[in-house]
């Protein structure tokens, strides 16, 4: 796609349609997905019986890595901050740390309970947080020392209350002294400064990572509600909580130690549970994937609370949904394991590329008149102009009527005289017309002055001989024609010859007369 042709005023930052989909070559179902920090790679965990991991190049849509180790369904995938390591967790209780450059296993751990969620520490790739099946405490794992630290919320709350009571003499009100909840979910915030725990009592517990103490607890739902997922926005301002009461809650993190609920999002029509939730890359939208076996529905709300888009996919359930880190793209996984890529619809504006290009809102079929393209003479055209000017009712609005001036110009063009006998001299030529030029070689003056035309060395010798032959043939032809049929010119020549003969005879007679006279005079004497 050419970005120069996209109208900047109509660009949408919300996905609207499925552009393409990704399928495992061996038709193994996908179960979870995660982008790296830049969104160039997409890691996909597959379901049973082969819990392999596929790493897709999101630009070329090709598989660049295939990792095998798990025997159960892969439930969670987490990228390191530098994008060189991958952390995967499975239903079989295995946790694996991968080196993507070599496809080798850097660390592996086998637990007795299925692992539901695992993620890297946002600032330290040597630490990770593990969430196990309900009833088991979350674990903080150090890869270097292999130290596993269980995080029991009840014991942490009790120790915090005792410490505060001993130091101040007052029981702190920021925590519940009668807390009996069980952790169901845990996650680092964006900076890794705190760990947020969700439990089975609809409460969120905040653990300070440095002091490893619970310093805050707040309720988000009723006591019999389970917190299923916690997500954080990229700008560190909001937290999104998904619970079992079919409601997504937006909580503000701007105030220190004051977590205020801002919005609630739910499907008021179907009243379905939410399978997954996330934030958009620009922190302006909240996404919720519906948990239904035959409906692939994704709701997009603005942070202000209004519903922006309801994306309807194929008639199959949704397993996971993630938003691209930088672009308006959503990746969703269906029950059949197909990965759908949702993108925004960009409307290309060709008028910005070609200013003289006119855009049409709709296509119009033009129907011409029966005699529109018939050949007509000037009289008929003049009559047509008069008729059209007098009555324009019922005419085709797309047909252009010729004016009298246009008809006169057309007639003048037809009557224009074109001289084909004489060609104007071309004063200049381009390089493409050099083949049309004719060049003559100059004649040396010495040949003209010293050499005669009948000399073969003369450059015009051949032309001279040819002209001579032509003249001789012309003379012979004229002689033959004069002898065969006399003409007025021949008669005049004969008359001139006769007159000259008479004159000569007269002169001879005069001479003879003079001689006789002289002889007579001599005799007399």
UniProtKB/Swiss-Prot annotation:
Bias kind Low complexity: ranges: 383-392, 472-500
UniProt cross-references to Pfam families, sorted A to Z: ANAPC4_WD40, WD40
SUPFAM superfamilies: WD40 repeat-like
Coiled-coil residues: none
Region feature (Disordered): 371-398, 462-525
WD repeats: 25-66, 69-108, 222-261, 267-312, 313-352
Keyword Amino-acid biosynthesis: no
InterPro entries the record matches: Apc4-like_WD40_dom, RBBP5/Swd1, WD40/YVTN_repeat-like_dom_sf, WD40_repeat_CS, WD40_repeat_dom_sf, WD40_rpt
GO CC annotation, single: Set1C/COMPASS complex
Biased composition (Basic and acidic residues): 462-471, 501-525
Protein name as annotated: Retinoblastoma-binding-like protein E
Lineage per the UniProt record: Eukaryota, Amoebozoa, Evosea, Eumycetozoa, Dictyostelia
Gene name of this polypeptide: rbbE
């Amino acid at each position: 796609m050419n970005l120069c042709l996209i109208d900047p005023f109509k660009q949408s930052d919300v996905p609207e349609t499925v552009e393409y989909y990704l399928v495992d070559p061996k038709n193994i179902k996908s179960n979870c997905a995660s982008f790296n920090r830049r969104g160039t790679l997409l890691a996909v965990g597959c379901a049973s019986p082969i819990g392999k991991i596929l790493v897709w190049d999101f630009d070329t849509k090709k598989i660049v890595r295939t990792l095998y180790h798990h025997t159960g369904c892969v439930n969670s995938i987490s990228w390191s901050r530098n994008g060189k390591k991958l952390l995967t967790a499975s239903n079989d209780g295995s946790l694996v740390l991968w080196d993507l450059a070599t496809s080798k296993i850097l660390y592996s751990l086998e637990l007795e309970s299925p692992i539901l969620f695992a993620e890297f520490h946002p600032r330290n790739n040597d630490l990770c947080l593990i969430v196990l099946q309900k009833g088991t405490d979350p674990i903080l794992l150090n890869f270097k020392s292999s130290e596993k630290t269980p995080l029991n919320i009840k014991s942490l709350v009790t120790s915090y209350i005792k410490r505060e009571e001993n130091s101040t003499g007052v029981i702190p009100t920021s925590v519940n002294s009668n807390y009996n909840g069980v952790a169901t979910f845990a996650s680092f915030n964006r900076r890794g400064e705190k760990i947020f725990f969700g439990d089975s009592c609809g409460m969120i517990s905040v653990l300070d990572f440095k002091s490893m103490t619970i310093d805050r607890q707040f309720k988000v739902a009723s006591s019999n509600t389970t917190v299923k997922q916690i997500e954080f926005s990229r700008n560190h301002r909001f937290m999104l909580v998904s619970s079992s009461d079919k409601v997504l809650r937006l909580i503000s993190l701007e105030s220190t130690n004051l977590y205020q609920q801002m919005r609630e999002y739910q499907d008021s029509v179907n009243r379905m549970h939410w399978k997954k939730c996330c934030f958009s890359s620009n922190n302006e939208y909240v996404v919720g994937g519906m948990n239904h076996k035959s409906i692939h529905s994704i709701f997009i709300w603005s942070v202000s609370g209004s519903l922006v888009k309801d994306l309807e996919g194929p008639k199959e359930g949704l397993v996971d949904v993630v938003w691209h880190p930088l672009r308006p793209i959503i990746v969703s996984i269906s029950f059949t394991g197909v990965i759908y890529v949702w993108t925004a619809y960009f409307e290309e504006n060709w008028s910005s590329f070609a200013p003289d290009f006119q855009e049409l809102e709709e296509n119009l079929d033009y129907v011409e008149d029966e005699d529109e393209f018939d050949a007509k003479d000037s009289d008929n055209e003049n009559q047509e102009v008069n008729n059209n000017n007098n009555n324009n009712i019922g005419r085709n609005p797309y047909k252009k009527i010729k004016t009298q001036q246009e008809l006169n110009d057309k007639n003048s063009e037809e009557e224009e005289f074109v001289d084909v006998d004489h060609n104007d001299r071309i004063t200049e030529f381009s390089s493409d017309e050099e083949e049309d030029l004719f060049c003559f070689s100059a004649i040396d003056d010495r040949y003209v002055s010293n050499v005669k035309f009948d000399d073969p060395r003369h450059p015009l010798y051949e032309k001279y001989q040819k002209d001579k032959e032509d003249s001789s043939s012309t003379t012979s032809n004229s002689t033959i024609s004069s002898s065969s049929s006399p003409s007025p010119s021949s008669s005049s020549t004969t008359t001139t010859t006769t007159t000259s003969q008479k004159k000569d005879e007269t002169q001879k007679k005069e001479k003879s007369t003079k001689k006789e006279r002289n002889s007579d005079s001599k005799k007399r004497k």
